[in-house]
């Protein structure tokens, strides 16, 4: 037994250390949240398209030559940024993001040709790919027990930053028009970006990351090493090539991929991954081109207010999704089909409004976009939960990275065919007609799948118990879901993902945790 005096002395030594750790953690949380808030303050972002049209770029140039560069370059930089984020341990990528934003606004201020604006889109694609660094970085500095709180704080900071930026832009836009200074919003945005760059230089760089700089590797002899130490009778000593192949087969990434292939047999995982890929591609095409669609009324511009309203509604719908409690094994496809059908109807309204004269077109476009974005954000935390509920933290990062890449590839292919002048080069109104058909086809496919699931359940599934209804609660899920079997990952426990999809305001594991916390 330990003497009482030694126990008291040990506790007395631990208390100051715990106090210092708590104080350090609070300071770190505040600084990260402040950086996340300031990094979103770009009041000119909602008005980039009107600014380009004021600089004598035509709608055709913006639609068919400038904007299509964004998905192309995003696809090109996505994988390198994804890997470098982990290899360089996050902080350098956050600095790169700020530098890329500086290049974006410098090109907006100084550029005069289509080539300059296309280069601006290339730098903007780097900032989009680099958003993954912030969402991963915040979880590498704290203990797992603090993940949920960190996620809620950081997510709230980002949402508040986007909302504030949109409102500020809307307030300053009329002043810019009256002052005849078309660059005022761009200069203010550049100032905020430079300040964010200064903040990023003082961020603490973590010692470990998810894949390349792991903190707790399983140190065990590989099969080829065991064969070399104790070769069997009559077996030749393995050569260099065989040892290299053995190391590759037993590498962490290969083990993760083999584990992922096994997990893809789960119907719910496949379903929500497919939703992520196909719906995200259509969603971001709408986001890219909706500002061009709004340019039909040059005398009325409430882009900032609409972005603020859509951000607020997205936060509300994402939060409300946390209270949905149904049997997802039975109703997932029906829920997805219903939401996508709503999206299809809203996009079709955006298209049809150009052919009617009895409504104020711009207000209908504003309202349908706000509702469209809110509908998409309703399913994001549900999809995040369904994907994360049976995967480890590392596998979640890999799955979301693959989903984002596939969605970007699909988005790029559609852009090449529909928008690019080397393809069909359609006007923006015709593009929205095609996008509405795209969403309608997805909805019909999901409805058919839901009907087939219902028929199977009625015929032979009544005696088979379905999984109980689940709320979107990662804390409960971490207790209910059993740990993964030994498949090369050392029995990693399921956890929510660290890496996010491309939209820094939206698709994230952090939003799931924040909403569950709320």
Swiss-Prot record:
The gene is SLC19A1. The modification N-acetylmethionine is found at residue 1. Antiporter that mediates the import of reduced folates, driven by the export of organic anions. Also acts as an importer of immunoreactive cyclic dinucleotides, but with a lower transporter activity. Mechanistically, acts as a secondary active transporter, which exports intracellular organic anions down their concentration gradients to facilitate the uptake of its substrates. Has high affinity for N5-methyltetrahydrofolate, the predominant circulating form of folate. Also mediates the import of antifolate drug methotrexate. This is Reduced folate transporter. GO terms for biological process: cyclic-GMP-AMP transmembrane import across plasma membrane; folate import across plasma membrane; positive regulation of cGAS/STING signaling pathway. InterPro entries: Folate_carrier, MFS_trans_sf, SLC19A1. Residues 480-518 are annotated as: Disordered. Keywords: Acetylation, Antiport, Cell membrane, Folate-binding, Glycoprotein, Membrane, Phosphoprotein, Transmembrane, Transmembrane helix, Transport. Residues 407-419 are annotated as: Required for substrate-binding. GO terms for cellular component: apical plasma membrane; basolateral plasma membrane. Residues 51-62, 111-114, 177-181, 293-300, 351-353, 416-423 are extracellular. The keyword Transmembrane helix applies. Pfam families: Folate_carrier (PF01770). Residues 1-29, 86-89, 138-151, 201-266, 324-329, 378-391, 449-512 are cytoplasmic.
